[in-house]
């Protein structure tokens, strides 16, 4: 089994996949078991790339609990058979910026999946074995 970490790294000071990789390696995951995707700029793109670049058919998505329903909706709608696991203990977001952002992201996910699929940087296949 391998772990695919994917996220945004468009800015020099912001590198989600590198931070995830470093965390896993410092917590006893062998470096060769961590596959890094630097082009997952959104949940939609991460799921498309997991399927179309890394050749995954099934996945366990690990994310914040409040984010999981949207991530699973996107992954399964794109044909990536997925289940989820919350990586935090926060049961419900507070009525703050994050919950407003998540609501907007849910609307965007629906529109992307039904009407306006975004361009996804795919590239060559790199199947995970």
PLM region spans:
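A structural signal for short, hydrophobic/glycine-enriched beta-strand patches
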Residues: 1-99
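A transmembrane-helix-recognition feature enriched in membrane-embedded lipid enzymes
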Residues: 96-122
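A short, charged, Gly/Pro-tolerant segment at domain boundaries
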Residues: 121-129
């Amino acid at each position: 089994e391998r772990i695919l970490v994917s996220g945004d790294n468009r800015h020099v000071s912001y590198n989600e996949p590198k931070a995830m990789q470093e965390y896993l390696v410092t917590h006893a995951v062998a470096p060769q078991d961590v596959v890094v995707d630097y082009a997952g700029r959104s949940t939609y793109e991460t799921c498309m790339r997991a399927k179309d670049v890394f050749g995954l058919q099934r996945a366990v998505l690990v994310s914040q609990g409040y984010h999981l329903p949207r991530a699973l909706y996107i992954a399964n709608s794109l044909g990536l058979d997925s289940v989820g696991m919350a990586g935090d203990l926060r049961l419900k977001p507070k009525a703050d910026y994050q919950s407003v952002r998540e609501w907007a992201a849910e609307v965007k996910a629906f529109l992307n999946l039904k009407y306006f699929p975004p361009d996804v940087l795919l590239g060559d296949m790199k199947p995970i074995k």
